């Protein structure tokens, strides 16, 4: 956020789905006027306690117009990790257009469909997501609400995301070459053709078979396998593969609220992380695989007894 303030020098920043105000807190620290729009009342209250002005609303064209009338147009509107959660994309985008100044900027971060498919990240497909965006489809969605996509950045977050930069359609702003370059990559990868999705399904099936074959083989050999992490993506993977305690004895998680509970659908017990060192399993299946570098270092102690880490995606890897 500091980079945005330095580069665009906004006088007023609005964040949609601003949560507890963490991001806008940096804007407040810079002395820039800001406003959060957050539908959750209790979370919005936390933001206000930390000094971030916040209204409790779901964004719509009407809410966007009202906020603009009361607070003025925003030089920058930020919407991170929310665009895929919206059933009414056109209405939400029209709300963004209502908020932003006629010469302003809209910044949206969302998971990139290209990376999801290239790296077989099927476990990041959640029921709470209504859409999965390529740059090509995002450009169309934005245009439907009166915004023109003018630039795109590739980000490593969530296994691969995109930051979309859009401006009011009528401004006629120049479009970065990066937009066309990424769309060309998407087309080459088959994202604009139904056959590409069939190939993705075939790769996902192989990832599933390989993981199950490993777990069954380990069980047959009497080797112990436990999990690390109980993230949302892990629940998708466990349920898709049909992995239950006969193949994965338990998993651990740092969140104390999950201890003593079970993974939904598959009923794998969840314990504190210390359980791994106590039991010294042969293998640890890492469910938040997107944190591979960090967790390989964090779980290096598993090697002390000859244990190994297992990463299921993009393909089975035992290290």
Task: Name what the model sees in each region.
Residues 90-105, 300:
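A short glycine-rich, Lys/Arg-flanked "PGG" loop and its adjoining helix->strand segment in the class I
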Residues 75-78:
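A conserved beta-strand element that flanks and buttresses the S-adenosyl-L-methionine
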Residues 9-19, 224-228:
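Conserved class I S-adenosyl-L-methionine
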Residues 106-131, 135-138, 142:
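Short, glycine-/aromatic-enriched active-site segment of Class I SAM-dependent methyltransferases
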Residues 51-66, 269-270:
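Conserved SAM-binding strand-loop segment of SAM-dependent methyltransferases
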Residues 20-32:
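Conserved SAM-binding loop of SAM-dependent methyltransferases across substrates and taxa
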Residues 158-203:
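Flexible, glycine-/basic-rich loop-and-beta segments that form/coincide
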Residues 103-111, 307-314:
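Conserved beta-strand signature within the Rossmann-like core of class I S-adenosyl-L-methionine
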